[in-house]
Amino acid sequence: MAQLSQVPYLLRATRGELLDRPPVWMMRQAGRYMKAYRDLREKYPSFRERSENTDIAVEISLQPFHAFKPDGVILFSDILTPLPAIGIDFDIIESKGPIIDPPIRTEAQIDKLHPIEPEESLPFIREILQTLRREVKNEAAVLGFIGAPWTLAAYAIEGKSCKDYTNIKKMAFCQPEMLHKFLGKLAEAIAVYARYQINSGAQVIQMFDSWAGQLSPQDYETFALPYQKLVVQEVKKTHPNTPFILYINGSAGLLERMPQTGVDIVSVDWSVDIAEARQRLGNNICVQGNIDPGVLFGSQEFIKSRILETIRKAGNRGHILNLGHGVLKETPEENVEFFFKTAKEISSLLALTA
């Protein structure tokens, strides 16, 4: 049993300590693949109720912790959760995803947005994180998370999930000043929100810029990277020792640029070999990832082989084992259990297969 004075395994990895195995957790480890989650969803069909009611969100956050004992427990929430606190309302429709109506398309709408006051608008976040810290103790690190400005802007401007990002790219290339104003406001709000999560108990922050991989490297440097960097800089001013993870879906073409944001860890998807990713990122950055979530549909022997291969390639320092994206909803729960069990036993498995 870990004591409050002990340092969680995941935090030790972010400090570059030499460990006998990498810490392990999964993006979307609390979710639809778990029967316990589906049962709770039947009782509480509204996503916003599940994520904004303290008791329900804590229960969901802890479901995978009780079942699999990952080294990280992430807040059950959504990257859009802080948007109403600045004046952008949203809903999440089952099978359709987020809906923002009306979408943000004019300068007048941007000018109406107001600074975020998390304690007034988002007190449930503090309550959830404080409760998770008490429940988890230091048996695992508690992670908070935020959406990056580009991805939040994409949802707000498109009004929904989409494939081609027509409206935000139209704004970027036809009215860049207006988009920069919006991105700046989002960055300020997100930095305040991240600090609030840390002050409430989050020991690590992961920033998701899910749609930045849709940008060319040139446009990433113009519309995404500066605002990621602004968020990190603002948070590091007050919380310099809190590890910061950056995840971009489809980041293979952007890897060398991601450390420029000032983050401590880059979360890599499966579109790049993790040994190559480490080489491209340099020695001063920890890496997280990067197993294809589809691997969890394979046989347990196949899953084990991919875990071993990934850990060997990533090296024995500064690596957090994770998927390259979130757990897919059809994933067999027993395979997730096997993944965690194997990851925890990896030091003996590596010795046997050396």
UniProtKB/Swiss-Prot annotation:
Domain of life per record: Bacteria
Reactions catalysed according to its record: uroporphyrinogen III + 4 H(+) = coproporphyrinogen III + 4 CO2
GO molecular-function terms, A-Z: uroporphyrinogen decarboxylase activity
An annotated GO cellular component: cytoplasm
Keywords: Cytoplasm, Decarboxylase, Lyase, Porphyrin biosynthesis
Site (Transition state stabilizer): D78
PROSITE patterns membership: UROD_1 (PS00906)
Gene3D superfamilies, per database record: 3.20.20.210
Top EC group: lyase
GO terms for biological process, alphabetical: protoporphyrinogen IX biosynthetic process
Intracellular or extracellular location(s): Cytoplasm
Annotated substrate binding sites: R28, Q29, A30, G31, R32, D78, Y155, S210, H325
InterPro entries noted in UniProt: UROD/MetE-like_sf, Uroporphyrinogen_deCO2ase_HemE, Uroporphyrinogen_deCOase
Enzyme Commission number: 4.1.1.37
Major site of localization recorded for this protein: cytoplasm
Pathway assigned in UniProt: Porphyrin-containing compound metabolism; protoporphyrin-IX biosynthesis; coproporphyrinogen-III from 5-aminolevulinate: step 4/4
Summary of the function given for this chain in its UniProt record: Catalyzes the decarboxylation of four acetate groups of uroporphyrinogen-III to yield coproporphyrinogen-III.
Record's subunit section: Homodimer.
Family as reported in the entry's similarity comment: Belongs to the uroporphyrinogen decarboxylase family.
Full protein name: Uroporphyrinogen decarboxylase
Gene: hemE
